[in-house]
Design a protein with these regions (language model features):
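Solvent-exposed beta-hairpin/edge-strand motifs
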Residues: 325-343
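C-terminal beta-strand-rich structural cap/linker in extracellular carbohydrate-active enzymes
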Residues: 349-371
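Catalytic cores of secreted or luminal carbohydrate-active enzymes
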Residues: 238-285
Length: 371
């Protein structure tokens, strides 16, 4: 869980802005809630490498260097994240890591970087796609530093190929794994793919079923206050973070923390949502479809369950949740007792089935236990 300043600041990033954002994360209780990464993007270096092929820090923007910045963030309980590219250039035109994975990985480690967002950008047609990923994986491992490796792309076959090549699938608090991987798909809802004709919410809903047994990759980056993604409404934001939580999918908020509203902070720091997201067992959810909605159920520790219910229609509807599909036997005499994590409203105890009334495209996230 963390924040990215790439969209809000872009090339205007500098040391003061980063430390100000970090202080705001602490002030709003976001760090205490578990938002531990802060991505400063790709504009921290100069547009050209030095004579030895190394990336050069921009000392105008970061007069004390990234190593100082990393230490300053660590003192606040925050870890430093940066963006690099699979290809020749980064999104803002800075040097990419193609064919320089090992030298860049060493640089990142020396600068105290904790998280690498490896973006599929400016890849030469003959360079291939998967070999640079494997090289960066090996290069980061070779540094001996604990660096979180996140892949950011939109590629229809990437999950199958990553599984085939032996990459690890980890969920929940991926920072607990030395070589964890977050498959962060730049969904159409981020506005990256301008050719998409769907609305942001339609695109987001279309990817809710991107789920593979044993794989709980990142649903998306959430852009707050962005014209391409309307998360100003607390219920819209709650739906998006709930989808991430039920899939143990890391949440990266693409916004300046200072721009958050009080309601947005309440949603992002909700203890029930984070409890589901960071459950130590990190189980993939079961998906139960009906005519008008979808129910995701996930086994949690302490004999509890996460339940995410979505109305898939354009009208108000009552989405059924059948305990038989969930795995209960009617003769067991067990009952389901659950509450809405965002409102704390308790749902009536039920045995065979429940109907969850939702507005058009609405959702609710519950924590449930059997009694």
């Amino acid at each position: 869980m963390g924040f990215s300043l790439e969209k809000s600041l872009g090339e205007n990033i500098d040391q003061k802005a980063v430390l100000t954002a970090a202080d705001k994360m602490v002030e709003l209780g976001l760090v205490a809630a578990g938002y531990e990464y802060l991505n400063i993007g790709d504009a921290w270096c100069l547009p050209s490498r030095d004579d030895n092929g190394k990336l050069v820090e921009d000392t105008t923007k970061f007069p004390f260097g990234l190593k100082y910045l990393s230490a300053a963030l660590h003192a606040k309980g925050i870890k430093l994240a940066i963006t690099t590219s699979v290809g020749a250039l980064t999104p803002n035109g800075y040097p990419g890591s193609l064919d320089r994975e090992y030298i860049d990985a060493d640089t990142f480690a020396q600068l105290g970087v904790d998280y690498i967002s490896h973006v599929a950008c400016d890849i030469p047609a003959t360079a291939g796609f998967f070999t640079p990923l494997r090289r960066m994986n090996m290069a980061l491992r070779a540094t001996g530093r604990r660096i979180f490796y996140a892949l950011t792309f939109d590629h229809s076959k990437i999950m199958d190929r990553m599984y085939y090549t032996g990459y690890e699938w980890d969920g929940a608090d991926l920072s607990e794994y030395t070589n964890g991987y977050a498959i962060e798909k730049w969904l159409r809802s981020t506005g990256v793919n301008s050719f998409c004709t769907k609305s942001p919410d339609e695109a987001f809903d279309a990817h809710l079923d991107d789920n593979i047994i044993g794989y709980t990759g990142t649903q998306c980056w959430l852009s707050l206050g962005d014209v391409t993604v309307d998360c100003e409404c607390a219920c819209a934001l709650a739906k998006k973070v709930s989808a991430c939580a039920i899939k143990c999918s890391p949440i990266i908020i693409n916004a300046d923390p200072a721009a958050l509203t009080e309601k947005q902070v309440e949603v992002l720091t909700n203890k029930g949502m984070i409890r589901i997201l960071k459950d130590e067992e990190s189980r993939a959810p079961a998906v139960l479809k009906s005519d008008n909605g979808t129910v995701y159920t996930k086994l949690l520790t302490d004999r509890e369950y996460g339940v995410f219910v979505i109305n898939d229609t354009d009208n108000e509807a009552s989405v059924p949740f059948y305990t038989f599909d969930f795995g209960m036997v009617y003769s067991s005499e067990l009952k389901c007792d659950m509450y809405d994590v965002f409102t704390n409203e308790k749902h009536p105890v039920f045995t065979d089935a429940a109907r969850i009334k939702l507005p058009a495209k609405g959702s609710k996230l519950f924590i449930m236990k059997l009694v």
